[in-house]
Amino acid sequence: MSKGTSSMGKRQKRTHAKCRRCGSVSFNVHTKQCTSCGFGKTSRMRTYKWQAKCKY
C-alpha cells in the first residue's frame, strides 16, 4: 500500500453526486449522506448557527 504518486492515478471514481433534496453536488455515494443538507443522515435540514454572519 503506497500513498504517493502511484496511488493518485487510481482515484477516478465519483465521490459526490447530485442530492435529491437540496440539488447540490454533495451527496456522498459511498456513505449515502449529503454533506450540504444532511439527507440520508437526518430528516431535518442540516443547519448550524455558525453558518450565518454575526450581526453586531
UniProtKB/Swiss-Prot annotation:
One of its GO terms (biological process) is translation. Its cofactor is Zn(2+). Pfam families: Ribosomal_L37e. GO terms for molecular function: rRNA binding; structural constituent of ribosome; zinc ion binding. A zinc finger (C4-type) spans 19-37. One of its GO terms (cellular component) is ribosome. Keywords: Metal-binding, Ribonucleoprotein, Ribosomal protein, RNA-binding, rRNA-binding, Zinc, Zinc-finger. Binds 1 zinc ion per subunit. PROSITE patterns: RIBOSOMAL_L37E. Zn(2+) binds at C19, C22, C34, C37. InterPro entries: Ribosomal_eL37, Ribosomal_eL37/eL43, Ribosomal_eL37_CS, Ribosomal_zn-bd. Belongs to the eukaryotic ribosomal protein eL37 family. Binds to the 23S rRNA. NCBIfam families: PRK04179.1 (NF003214). This is Large ribosomal subunit protein eL37. It comes from Methanosarcina acetivorans (strain ATCC 35395 / DSM 2834 / JCM 12185 / C2A).
